[in-house]
């Protein structure tokens, strides 16, 4: 059958032999027949040798796979982990270990691989199924996976020698501290500083006054806020400010000429050095001797209604109020302590249970703190009073008043005599100012050249005259702003609080 096939092929056309491929020839008519005709010499000469080589390679693959499952997997995993380590020191150790293993296995491979089957396998290993197990660092896979006792002992000895060698200081390497390799001296320090397993540094100087939330470690701490705190005594506090009513004579000037030379006799007001306005010497002297660290700041605040029938100093005195000497930092510290203690009380213990007595203790502490806060509020509300003696001294004298100074201090009632008006006043000056709203009388005329404005009350004339002079006697103690009216200062002060 072989001779007939050869004759049939040669009868069609001689075969074309490919150069450098003596065992392979192609039929030129193969494209037309859609099939390739190979020369019989390609199959016959080397069938026995190739089959034997393939059988030997397959057997060695199975043996190497069995050896790899016993030992090689763990070994290469350790080498790969050391090679992929982010630490330069660990990579240095892995490279040194790999070089030692290469030298050792290279010497063993020359003596172990002497058979013809091994040489054939080395020639065809790149095209075999053994490629996943092939490591280019080693000359022979047979020497690598030879399951002998001597090899295991040798490997353990190499590992122990390597560990003992690298337990020494980094400076023991030759040339490690020379100027050309000085960069390696920082490896060990870099490993300690940037390692994920470096010891955690406790933040001793924790800023507990930050506006954001606290860390969980801060809340779980028994003393989240340090008791000792260095406060700057030279810094003025913003909250402990006493606001009292005014005894100003600007708003109740008795003169009908509208003279702007009246001096402001208000109680202590902190003057602004950048602004120059008429102020009494006693006020300036009090401002210079004022110490924010010893006493709360006193500021005049008035709230005058433009539609009131009474003088502004009288109608606004009911809005005067007083702030206690209250430290907001201390109050915030107590609130933070209560918050941290409450969080600890509601947290379960190791057994998952919550102590009801701890919760009750924290509730009692919160209740006590609320009572103290309400006490401060009650003391502040008690100071919301009207000083009648100051009001009497600020009232205008009334020529037609029926009040007798020789009589005991019994307040008389002054009734409005205008038809259909039943208002009653305790001071005749108030009644007189009110009665002008019925008659339309405006006895106070502006003395500024070219100004024809007239007013029924002297305080209204004083305010109007400040528009001409630009005088702003009411200054803010917190900033450089100044105002011509006390009620404007009162509105401005609310922005600071």
From Swiss-Prot:
Q: Which Pfam families match?
A: zf-C2H2
| Zinc finger residue ranges, C2H2-type | 414-438, 444-468, 474-496
Q: Could you provide one GO biological process annotation from this protein's UniProt record?
A: determination of adult lifespan
Q: Is Oxidoreductase tagged as a keyword?
A: no
**Chief subcellular site?**
nucleus
Please list the GO terms describing molecular function.
DNA-binding transcription factor activity, RNA polymerase II-specific; RNA polymerase II cis-regulatory region sequence-specific DNA binding; zinc ion binding
Q: Where is the composition biased (Low complexity)?
A: 397-407
Residue ranges of region Disordered?
371-407
Explain the consequences of disrupting this gene. Answer: RNAi-mediated knockown leads to increased cell death, perhaps by apoptosis, in the germline and uterus of hermaphrodites. Lipid contents in the intestine increase. RNAi-mediated knockdown causes reduced ability of dietary restriction to extend lifespan. Abolishes lifespan extension completely on an eat-2 mutant background, independent of whether knockdown is ubiquitous, or targeted only to the intestine.
Query: How far does the signal peptide extend, from start to end residue?
Result: none
The UniProt induction remark is:
Induced by treatment with high levels of paraquat, a chemical causing production of reactive oxygen species (ROS), but not by other exogenous stressors, such as heat shock or osmotic stress.
The reply to whether Iron figures as a keyword in the UniProt entry is: no
A GO cellular component annotated for this chain's UniProt record is: chromatin
Biased-composition ranges for Basic and acidic residues?
371-388
Q: Which Gene3D superfamilies does the record associate with it?
A: Classic Zinc Finger (3.30.160.60)
Location within or outside the cell: Nucleus; Cytoplasm
Q: In which tissues is it expressed?
A: Expressed in intestine, hypodermis and a few neurons.
**Post-translational modifications:** Ubiquitinated; probably preferentially monoubiquitinated by wwp-1.
Sorted alphabetically, the keyword list is:
Cytoplasm, DNA-binding, Metal-binding, Nucleus, Repeat, Transcription, Transcription regulation, Ubl conjugation, Zinc, Zinc-finger
Biological role stated in the UniProt entry: Transcription factor which modulates genes involved in lipid metabolism and the phase I detoxification pathway, including cytochrome P450 oxidases. Required for diet restriction- and mitochondrial dysfunction-mediated lifespan extension, perhaps acting in a ubiquitination-dependent manner. Involved in the response to oxidative stress. Plays a role in cell death.
**Family assignment?**
Belongs to the krueppel C2H2-type zinc-finger protein family.
Subunit arrangement? Interacts with E3 ubiquitin-protein ligase wwp-1 (via WW domains).
Write the protein's name.
Kruppel-like factor 1
The species this protein was found in:
Caenorhabditis elegans
